[in-house]
Every structure is written in C-alpha cells, then in structure tokens.
Amino acid sequence: MKIGVFVPIGNNGWLISTHAPQYMPTFELNKAIVQKAEHYHFDFALSMIKLRGFGGKTEFWDHNLESFTLMAGLAAVTSRIQIYATAATLTLPPAIVARMAATIDSISGGRFGVNLVTGWQKPEYEQMGIWPGDDYFSRRYDYLTEYVQVLRDLWGSGKSDFKGDFFTMDDCRVSPQPSVPMKVICAGQSDAGMAFSARYADFNFCFGKGVNTPTAFAPTAARMKQAAEQTGRDVGSYVLFMVIADETDDAARAKWEHYKAGADEEALSWLTEQSQKDTRSGTDTNVRQMADPTSAVNINMGTLVGSYASVARMLDEVATVPGAEGVLLTFDDFLSGIENFGERIQPLMQCRAHLPALTQEVA
C-alpha cells in the first residue's frame, strides 16, 4: 500500500481547534516535512490549494501558500518522492497548467503530477470576480472534462485545437513536453466526480470515515471500483486519514479529546454554511462530509487514534479493502508525527514490510 503525506500548505494543518498546534505555513516547514517523509520511504506528497479560509479564533486556513510554486520548490530539494500540486481549475487556464506541470516535471526528473479540483467554496472565487454562477455546481465536471482534454492534448502532442463550451484552443502549443506521462489525480466522491475519475484520473482520493473504523470507507472504494470497471480502467482509491498516535491508546485518546474540546466553533460554522451552498451535486460530496458535526474538528477525515501498534494494525486493515491502493496521511504535529510513523508505526505494518532499511540521515 502506498503512503503519502498531505502537506500543511495552510495554517494549522487539518485541526480546527484552539488546542491544536498553531503555526503558519512556510516553505521551510514543508521542506522539512517532505524531506523527512522521503527519508522514511513515503511514496508521495500532495498539497491542496485554498484561496480563502474559515476565519474564527484560529483564523483557520486564512493563511496559505500556493500549490504549484510550493511543490516546484519541494521538487528541487527532494530526489525520490512523488510530488503533486493542486490546480484550482477556475483560476488557471489549462494551457498554463500544462506548461507549469511540464516545468516541474523537468525540475523533479519526472516525479510530478497534478490534482484537479473544480472548486466548492464560492467566496474563494467571488473575491476575485471569477465565480461563474451557481449553475456551475451542476456543470463543474463538464468543465473539468474539457479542461483535462486540453491538458492531455498539450502533454501528449504539444498542440491543441480543442473546441468546446468552455475552452477554445487555436493551435495552442506547449513545449517541452513532460518527460514521462503526466499523472492526473482527483478527489471525487459524488457520482459525477467518480465518473470523471473513472474516465480520466490515475487514482482517486476519498475520505476515510469515523474514528478508529479503518475500513468504513469500503463502500466508497467499491463505488470507485465499479465506476472504473465501466470504463475498463484501473483507478484505485487513496484514502485520507489523520494519525494521532502516542505510546499508549489512552495517551493518544487524551490528545484527541483535548483537540475536540478546543474546537473553533466560529470557523466550523463557516464551513457548515459553505457546505450548504451546493444544492445540485447530491449529498455525497466531499464538503458535505467535511461539515458533518460528528468530527468536524478535523473536517471528518478518517481518524486513527491509538498507540503506535494500534495505528499500524489499523493501517494494515485499510490495505485489505478491495480497491484501496494507498493512504494520504495528516498528523496533529507533522514533524514529530512523520518521525514517529517512520520509526514506530511503519516497521510494524505488514503491508509495508517490503521497504528497504533506512540508510541515510534525515535532512
């Protein structure tokens, strides 16, 4: 099973709590995180894109770096780990993304890929005057289909004459082209999102579900597997989890309860309000899960709370789910979390037993 790190491109990572570590996103922090992840044989690193935060006491995600420029920098200071940036497709023409991706492919030596997102939080785009109207919610995957067609043209042949409802290319050129086939990843959980991923993505991210219920996402992975069977493609699921680990189950649980007790209710109210704006994509979207009050303090990603041995056992359970090819991990404290994962958790995981011994110093 592949292991990735979801780097904290926004302040405070993924805990919306006054009791969680409070920090700003910087290149130096993310450099240390990704170099440490590479040392411990993580397979990939991904950064999101967020253009406006949730506010509140913690100013959650009010402070964010930009994904492509951050990952270009990280590509230059790593050598093996795969690097993925996220394109907010309403903000960037596909021809520009194609050229930026080809550039980072050159920087990384073929280790780069692109995560495509349609956008769900209206204020991110309204503040710039580029929100296309609420009809976009029902047409966003039509838009993304044209977008990826242009990308594929330019990466494949260096030229596009695509004509569609959203994009018109007229002998559009990109050169040099990527040195290897460019991977495209997505995070669709709605029916439309999964259908798109089944046609165009190399793999699809989905949320884990619940606390210490590592296989509860299985129905989502099964839906993705079924959608991919309809297209004859192999599109695996990569599952998002937060790891909160300590020496004992009780110590880890105490940390989790402490974070929940400090939940930033003002920021969470903003998230809930924004999740209700899209009335056209159904009830199974990512943002609907993020705003579920059950565990909104960490946007309802699957949460693995326990001793190092308990977390290792639960991750091995994840690997048994059909269609699950990897996990994307966040941590309450990224630097110590990755080190503890590499030293205390990963060596206990049967699904990672194939890894070579650690031989180099952490940067």
From Swiss-Prot:
Induction: Up-regulated by the nitrogen regulatory protein C (NtrC also called GlnG) and repressed by RutR. It catalyses: uracil + FMNH2 + NADH + O2 = (Z)-3-ureidoacrylate + FMN + NAD(+) + H2O + H(+); thymine + FMNH2 + NADH + O2 = (Z)-2-methylureidoacrylate + FMN + NAD(+) + H2O + H(+). It comes from the Bacteria. Gene3D superfamilies: Luciferase-like domain (3.20.20.30). GO terms for molecular function: alkanesulfonate monooxygenase activity; uracil oxygenase activity. It holds the Pfam family Bac_luciferase. FMN binds at residues 49-50, 115, 124, 140-141, 190. Keywords: Flavoprotein, FMN, Monooxygenase, NADP, Oxidoreductase. Its EC number is 1.14.99.46. GO terms for biological process: alkanesulfonate catabolic process; nitrogen utilization; uracil catabolic process. Belongs to the NtaA/SnaA/DszA monooxygenase family. RutA subfamily. The FMN-N(5)-oxide reacts spontaneously with NADH to produce FMN. Requires the flavin reductase RutF to regenerate FMN in vivo. This is Pyrimidine monooxygenase RutA. It comes from Escherichia coli (strain SMS-3-5 / SECEC). The gene is rutA.
